[in-house]
A protein has these predicted regions:
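Short, Lys/Arg-enriched N-terminal segments with co-localized hydrophobic residues
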Residues: 14-29
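Short, low-complexity, charge-dense intrinsically disordered segments
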Residues: 7-13
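Intrinsically disordered, low-complexity segments enriched in small residues
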Residues: 29-125, 129-350
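Intrinsic low-complexity/disordered segments
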Residues: 8, 20, 345-346
Length: 350
C-alpha cells in the first residue's frame, strides 16, 4: 500500500491507494472506482428525504467530468417549464475524477442549476478546498431538489447526512455563517458552501461562498439555494480518493509542481494574484465596466487597480487553494489613512 498525505495552507489531504480493478465481495464482483467515489447523494428538501445512488459507468464514460455529468442530470430532470426559483429546479454540486488528489486545481467544484438570470443551463466554478472535501465525505455529486418549509443546512460527515435547522443563521452574511457553522459543529476544518442576504432574498445574480475564500460567482446559483431555503452545505470527510497507478500519478504531479511556477503567466499570477488580469483585459477591450456598457478605459483611470501597483505595498502573506502551487490569494493590511490597521483578503478579479 502507498499512502501519501500532504498538509499545507489549505489543509491538503490527498491520499493515493492502489487497488485491483475488481474485488470480490460476498462472492460477487463489485466495481472498484478510480478517481470517482462512486456515489451520488440526493436530498429532497420538500419531503426531508435523503438517498444515495451509485454513479453509473455510462455517465462517467459519456460525459466529461463533473461539469458534463451535472449538465446531463439537469437536462434529464428539468425542462422548459421548470421555474429556476421553484422547488423542481435542481441544485447540483459536482466534482471530477481527479478532485481531491494532488494535482493542481483539484479542490475546485462546479455548481449547476437552471439559472434565474436567463432560464437556461447555469454553471459556476469555485475553488478553495470545498470540492476536495465533497470527495473525502464519499460523494461525487450532491443533487438537491424541493424546498424546505424553513431555513435549513445540510451537514455531511463520513457517510452521515443530516438536514439541520438554520433559522439562527438566516440573515447572516457568508463569513459569519461559515464561522458559526464551524463553532456549532465543533471543527475548525469543516468546509462550507453558504449564501448571505442576497441569496436569501433571491437576487438573481447572488452567488454562494465557500470558506470565506472562494466564490462560484456566475449564473445566480446563490438565489437557487435561497429559493430552496437552503442556507448552507457543511462537509467534513476522511475518506480517500483511489488512483490506479499511484507511482506514475505522483510522478506526473511532481513534474507539474516543478514546471507550473516557472511559466511567465503563472509566475505573475503567483506574485500579484488575479488583479493582474485587469491590465491585460483593459488592453484587450475586455474589461467589463458599468455592467459591460464599457469595455476599456484610459490607463491612467484604471492603473491604480493593477495588481502590481498595490499588492506588494499591502501584502502580509500568501495562501493557496487545495493542492495548488500558485498562492495567488493575498492577505493585505492598510498601513495609513482612516482605515489604517484594517486587514483582510485583497480583491479578486476574473
Amino acid at each position: 500500500m502507498c499512502e501519501m498525505v500532504f498538509r499545507g495552507s489549505a489543509q491538503i489531504r490527498g491520499r493515493l491507494i492502489p487497488s485491483g480493478i475488481e474485488q470480490i465481495n460476498g462472492g460477487m464482483k463489485m466495481k472498484e472506482w478510480y478517481g470517482w467515489m462512486g456515489t451520488i447523494l440526493r436530498v429532497d428538501l420538500t419531503r426531508g428525504k435523503i438517498t444515495k445512488e451509485p454513479l453509473s459507468e455510462e455517465l462517467t464514460h459519456n460525459f466529461l467530468g463533473g461539469r458534463g455529468i451535472a449538465s446531463k442530470i439537469l437536462y434529464d430532470e428539468t425542462g422548459a417549464e421548470t421555474d429556476p426559483l421553484g422547488p423542481d429546479n435542481r441544485l447540483i454540486i459536482s466534482t471530477g475524477p481527479i478532485s481531491g488528489t494532488l494535482l493542481l486545481g483539484t479542490g475546485r467544484f462546479i455548481v449547476t442549476a437552471k439559472s434565474p438570470m436567463h432560464g437556461h443551463l447555469g454553471q459556476a466554478s469555485g475553488g478553495g478546498a470545498f470540492g476536495a472535501e465533497v470527495k473525502f465525505a464519499g460523494y461525487d455529486h450532491i443533487v438537491v431538489q424541493g424546498r424546505a418549509k424553513k431555513p435549513v443546512y445540510l451537514w455531511l460527515h463520513d457517510g452521515e447526512v443530516e438536514i439541520r435547522d438554520a433559522q439562527h443563521l438566516w440573515g447572516k452574511d457568508t463569513w459569519e455563517t461559515g464561522k458559526l457553522l464551524r463553532e456549532e459543529l465543533g471543527d475548525r476544518y469543516i468546509r462550507s458552501l453558504c449564501i448571505g442576504p442576497a441569496g436569501e432574498n433571491l437576487a438573481n445574480f447572488a452567488c454562494p461562498m465557500t470558506d470565506e475564500e472562494a466564490v462560484p460567482s456566475k449564473t445566480g446559483t446563490g438565489a437557487v439555494m435561497g429559493s430552496k431555503n437552503l442556507k448552507a452545505i457543511a462537509i467534513r470527510g476522511s475518506q480517500s480518493v483511489k488512483v490506479a497507478d499511484p507511482g506514475r500519478y505522483v510522478g506526473i504531479v511532481r513534474k507539474w509542481w516543478e514546471v507550473i511556477p516557472k511559466v511567465p503567466f503563472t509566475a505573475t499570477l503567483k506574485n500579484v494574484g488575479t488583479p493582474w488580469l485587469i491590465k491585460m483585459f483593459n488592453k484587450q477591450y475586455n474589461l467589463a465596466i458599468r455592467n459591460a456598457q464599457e469595455v476599456c478605459r484610459p490607463e491612467e483611470e484604471v492603473s491604480h487597480f493593477y495588481g502590481e501597483n498595490f499588492v506588494p505595498k499591502y501584502r502580509i502573506r500568501d495562501f493557496a487553494c487545495f493542492a495548488c502551487r500558485l498562492p495567488c490569494q493575498k492577505f493585505v493590511r492598510i498601513h495609513d489613512g482612516p482605515y489604517a490597521g484594517e486587514k483582510g483578503r485583497r480583491p479578486e478579479y476574473g
